[in-house]
């Protein structure tokens, strides 16, 4: 079977379980998925997940089913709860794209899949063009939405910005659109780095003002001596954020600001406590659905 073929997994959930499924998929590094309301119902959604065949053998798929069953609190012996099918690469490209649409974020941004023409009614928006390929989504996750919503309210003109966990590069692109003079993007997945570079090029025609780094945040800032950052945006999982906070503090200049997202509302108090312990001043907390975004600052009188 061709290595570029895909498994498509389909199942149905109660609509209020969407966020916990998204959280788990992100935790597992799975980014090719969609949710759709079932016809004539508002409380059920159909979940579609695409997984590359060459990376998911029978044992891996079985383990994945058990993870989802545990998450949904259902018996993993239920017949036909999961529907697996095989999608050829050329068919995957068609089936995947049909679930994407332009998305307005905040007051100023429009995330636009690159194969969709811009409607004239959006000419006054800051356009973020995205072609995520096989690995990354188009920014519809609430944590990305919260980051963009907060970023558009922050003065980034002529500032040095660090994007931790860049993924498809949406937040790096947004920072440049908002006037950042330099954007540093870090991700530990080479596919993400490729996607960030590709989408930045798609939006600006070049890679000027962008530096990308492959590796973990703690490794990269030590190796490349990233310092005196004006603004950090960190959209990853809470457990990873907790480990990064001391070094994020060190790489910020005085009065530098940071946004943390990818945090469930139930996790925000613990993150805030760690921020304060590391001499970061809490400025604001916002939320969307089950997710929180924390905005903080390194105070001027701190070293």
From Swiss-Prot:
Keyword Endoplasmic reticulum: no
Entry's Gene Ontology BP terms: methylation
Protein keywords: Cytoplasm, Methyltransferase, S-adenosyl-L-methionine, Transferase
Family: Belongs to the methyltransferase superfamily. PrmA family.
Record-level Gene Ontology MF annotations: protein-lysine N-methyltransferase activity
Binding residues for S-adenosyl-L-methionine: 144, 165, 187, 235
Cysteines paired by S-S bonds: none
Protein name from the UniProt record: Ribosomal protein L11 methyltransferase
Reactions this protein catalyses: L-lysyl-[protein] + 3 S-adenosyl-L-methionine = N(6),N(6),N(6)-trimethyl-L-lysyl-[protein] + 3 S-adenosyl-L-homocysteine + 3 H(+)
Protein function: Methylates ribosomal protein L11.
HAMAP family: Methyltr_PrmA
SUPFAM superfamilies, sorted: S-adenosyl-L-methionine-dependent methyltransferases
Assigned GO CC terms: cytoplasm
Gene3D superfamilies with a match to the protein in the record: Vaccinia Virus protein VP39
Localisation per UniProt entry: Cytoplasm
EC number: 2.1.1.-
InterPro entries assigned: Ribosomal_L11_MeTrfase_PrmA, Ribosomal_PrmA_MeTrfase, SAM-dependent_MTases_sf
Pfam families for this protein: PrmA
Domain of life: Bacteria
């Amino acid at each position: 079977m061709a290595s570029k073929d895909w498994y498509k997994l389909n199942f149905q959930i109660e609509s209020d379980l969407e966020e916990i499924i998204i959280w788990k998929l992100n935790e597992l590094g799975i980014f090719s998925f969609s949710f759709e309301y079932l016809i004539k119902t508002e409380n059920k959604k159909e979940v579609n997940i695409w997984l590359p065949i060459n990376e998911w053998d029978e044992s891996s798929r079985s383990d994945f089913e058990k993870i989802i069953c545990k998450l949904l609190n259902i018996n993993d012996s239920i017949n036909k709860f999961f529907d697996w099918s095989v999608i050829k690469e050329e068919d995957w490209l068609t089936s995947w794209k049909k679930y994407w649409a332009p998305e307005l974020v905040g007051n100023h941004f429009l995330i636009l899949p690159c194969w969709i023409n811009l409607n004239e009614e959006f000419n006054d928006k800051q356009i973020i063009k995205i072609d995520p390929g096989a690995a990354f989504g188009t920014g519809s996750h609430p944590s990305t939405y919260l980051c963009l919503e907060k970023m558009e309210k922050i003065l980034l003109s002529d500032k040095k910005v660090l994007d931790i966990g860049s993924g498809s590069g949406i937040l790096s692109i947004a920072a440049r659109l908002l006037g950042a003079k330099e954007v540093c993007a870090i991700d530990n997945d080479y596919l993400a780095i490729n996607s960030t570079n590709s989408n930045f090029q798609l939006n600006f025609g070049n890679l000027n003002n962008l530096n990308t780094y492959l590796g973990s945040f703690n490794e990269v800032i030590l190796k490349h001596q990233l310092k005196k950052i004006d603004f950090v945006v960190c959209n990853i999982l809470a457990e990873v954020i907790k480990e990064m906070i001391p070094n994020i503090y060190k790489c910020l200049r005085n009065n530098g600001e940071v946004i943390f997202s990818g945090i469930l509302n139930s996790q925000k108090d613990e993150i805030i406590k760690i921020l304060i312990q590391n001499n970061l001043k809490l400025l604001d907390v916002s939320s969307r659905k089950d997710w929180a975004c924390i905005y903080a600052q390194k105070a001027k009188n701190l070293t």
